[in-house]
Amino acid sequence: MSDVLFIEGGRVIDPASGVDGVRTVVIRDGKVAEVAERVERPRDARAVDARNRWVTPGFVDLHVHLREPGQEYKETVATGARAAVAGGFTAVCAMPNTKPVNDCAAVTELVLARAAAAGLARVYPVGAISRGSNGEELAEYGELKASGCVALSDDGRPVMSSALMRRALEYARAFGLPLTVHEEDLHLVGKGVMHEGAAATRLGLKGIPSQAEDVMVLRDIALVELTGGRLHVAHVSTAGAVRAIREAKRRGLPVTGEVTPHHLALTDDDVGASGYSTDFKMNPPLRSAEDVRACREGLADGTLDAIATDHAPHSAVEKDVEFDAAANGIVGLETAFSVCLGLVREGALTERRLVEALTVGPARAFGLPAGTLARGAAADVAVLDAAAEWTVDPARLHSKGRNTPWKGRRLAGRCTHTIVGGRIVHEEGKADR
């Protein structure tokens, strides 16, 4: 069989290259060989019929929880990678809050070995900012980078010590690593479990004010100005955080940010509308309609660089409990494109900006070799049917997690083919490869 693959007749949307039009993508030896309007295909060459579909660079997710090692009952690198390619993601960044925490080469190498064995999405490990993510002593950044980490985070745990955060930014700068930070002041969070506002009052639940995020974002931007380190703000959820990042960028500071599909599409009112469903409990919590508008505007104008899922699978035991006691987080790799395509239909985003925020935007934020269909780039591609409608059935997801707020929702937009390094690793309607 020929080692050449043709993706024919689709609308190629590649913001990194400025391409948007019907083209044929030619893949040879795992690389993009050509993107052209007219290409003659040899008889023995494999082909994907992409007529009436979008063809984009494979999606890049800067924020996923693959749970391995230590929590394989929730997810494994293999099941998470399978969910990723089913959603069009060809590269994912694995957060370090595993058991043990990824604060050393041994854990990083294990994650990479599991990813290689799965042979699906590319997995980029994120190392811990502090040893054990305990916020007391910095991890060995040189060791983490040398073993394959592309960024650093104590994800799920804010770095409460300003002195430690300063040292982390300085130390990470020496290795060219961004810090991707969960921003919340735990003193303001207290025992809160949802956004502080009228909805929390009606539901009788303790609230978390938006300012818990805002003050930490402002602090860390000030520390970036002091140190010159690179800051990436994880899962932005407040209007104040968007304003702070916008101003930091205006001043030329090395600050980037991401936002999740759920913080773009849901509000704190959905907690009550769902009947206290724990599939609507996450951290940061679903915010007010004003915050959602600000996040949408921030994504549309480029203040926020990337859409990231914060894919966080949990077992039923951890979710089928009272709202106060339930684990935070939802799965999102397989629904992200569909949910965000809804924003395009609402007029909140353009098609180009949606693709940009799923591809070259995140790739640039972390300096990853991804997010483009330029000649010579790795042939990581998503083929998408933007018109296809489907109903979310948690039992049919590839992830081990079933914790999705989109259960039973009718969504539009499916990934029909995912290609990694020139190999078709996902084809809708066919058995897993």
UniProtKB/Swiss-Prot annotation:
Q: Where is the active site?
A: D310
UniProt keyword annotation of Nuclease present: no
The pathway noted for it is: Pyrimidine metabolism; UMP biosynthesis via de novo pathway; (S)-dihydroorotate from bicarbonate: step 3/3
BP term (GO), one: 'de novo' UMP biosynthetic process
Q: What does this protein need as cofactor?
A: Zn(2+)
User: What EC identifiers does the entry list?
Assistant: 3.5.2.3
* Task of the protein: Catalyzes the reversible cyclization of carbamoyl aspartate to dihydroorotate.
Name used for this protein in its record? Dihydroorotase
Could you tell me which species this protein originates from?
A: Anaeromyxobacter sp. (strain K)
| Biological classification of the source | Bacteria, Pseudomonadati, Myxococcota, Myxococcia, Myxococcales
